[in-house]
Amino acid sequence: MTFKNLFHPDKVYLLDVLHGLTNLPPQYANVIIFDPPYNIGKDFGNNFDNLDFTDYLEWADKWIKQGIRVLNDSGTMYIYGFSEILAHIFVRINLPKRWLVWHYTNKNSPKNFFWQRSHESIIAVWKDTDKRIFNLDAVREPYTDVFLKNAAGKERAATPGRFSHGNKKTIYTAHENGALPRDVIKVSALAGGAGRVERFFYCDTCENIFMLENRGDHKEHKIIEHPTQKPTELTKKLLLASKPSEGGKVVVPFAGTGSELYIAKKLGMEAIGFEINEDYYCMSNLLIQKGFPNGKI
């Protein structure tokens, strides 16, 4: 059976990550987003979030190896995780890479009387720096008020060094599309009020998805909630940074809610995902087909 007959875009397949990836051809994907279990004991309906740490790293090596094979030379692979876990994975990847930080301030654990976690990390991996796609203007950020007030348009004194322009005076300029993107991405987590717009659930009884505001309509039903749904704003930024000018292919090996595939589809990209949890498999495909129930995303 050929690849074209095996997989069709904009769909999640009920397959293990390794089984799915090994059936994709080399150089297939422009973007791969890995959002694996972090090995911290969360309930994903399987045991892959509670492995011996050595076993976890060896398992990660396998799907990362397949991800590298599937990634094309101009593509980027993103891997989510907590810093203390990703640090071990980072040093095992022998390719160009960059450490990104997803910073949020709206999530805490009141019972944890210690340093509150306010970030997760993302490793960006690519094969060839000369060929890698990075759409700078698509991910520029707003300038700070301080820069716009005190520096933009003003004269910069001549100083020795690599930015001295021949030891001449220059002008601070503000790019019309915003500042250069930073490696700290500030996006609210889907907690509290920030989660109301896009956190959604799967009703196994109704075989449909619904938003948080409609949870009261399903009181006696079997409700499935994914514990690590990522914000669509964050996903959109990663995809916009790395997508080709036209089309492009995305692979999401741990599909979860399917939100990454949904955003990829909205951006005109073809997306394929894999998921071994049957509830999440149903949940993700419904999202891709129907979109968010509130129609706001």
Residue ranges and their predicted role:
Residues 279-297:
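Cysteine-dependent PTP/DSP-like catalytic domain, specifically the C-terminal lobe
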Residues 1-273, 277-283:
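Core catalytic lobe of class I
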